[in-house]
Amino acid sequence: MKKLTSENSHRQQKVASIINEALIEILHRGKMLDPRLYDCPLTITKIIVTADLKIANCYFLPFNTKLTPQEITESLNNSKNAIRNFVTGKINMKYSPDIRFHYDHGFDNALKVEQLLKDTNNI
């Protein structure tokens, strides 16, 4: 039985890195994307590729935008096929991973923890 580890293999990290570079390039160009993404600066915070390299979970953080995280996720998912085709051209694999977009709640959670710590210090 195969041992499950939380560590990513070198191959997973390499695929995540290539996907990250391709995402940055296509988001910068803005071609073939949902029009709502044109004026929506995004940071790709992390990409986690499954062990079988079939799924890439991409976490993003928007900056200075009027769109909600749900609207941005919807826009990215509407553009998923164009993004996947672009990534396929950059990656040398038999199958291109399915790209799934998620809002990164890490920053929001850090702010909540910081506020809780401030509140407890004031007691």
From Swiss-Prot:
Q: Where in the cell is it found?
A: Cytoplasm
Instruction: Just give the chief location class.
Output: cytoplasm
List the Gene3D superfamilies hit by this protein, alphabetically: 3.30.300.20
Output the superkingdom of the source species.
Answer: Bacteria
Q: Which UniProt keywords apply?
A: Cytoplasm, Ribosome biogenesis
Q: Does the keyword Cell inner membrane apply?
A: no
Q: Name one GO cellular component term.
A: cytosol
Is the keyword Protein transport assigned to this protein?
A: no
Question: What pairs make up the disulfide bonds?
Answer: none
**Any single GO BP term:** maturation of SSU-rRNA
GO molecular function term, any single one: ribosomal small subunit binding
Give the similarity note.
Belongs to the RbfA family.
The protein's matches in HAMAP family, at most eight in alphabetical order, are given as: RbfA
Tell me the subunit arrangement.
Answer: Monomer. Binds 30S ribosomal subunits, but not 50S ribosomal subunits or 70S ribosomes.
Q: What does this protein do?
A: One of several proteins that assist in the late maturation steps of the functional core of the 30S ribosomal subunit. Associates with free 30S ribosomal subunits (but not with 30S subunits that are part of 70S ribosomes or polysomes). Required for efficient processing of 16S rRNA. May interact with the 5'-terminal helix region of 16S rRNA.
Q: What is this protein called?
A: Ribosome-binding factor A
Organism, as annotated = Rickettsia bellii (strain OSU 85-389)
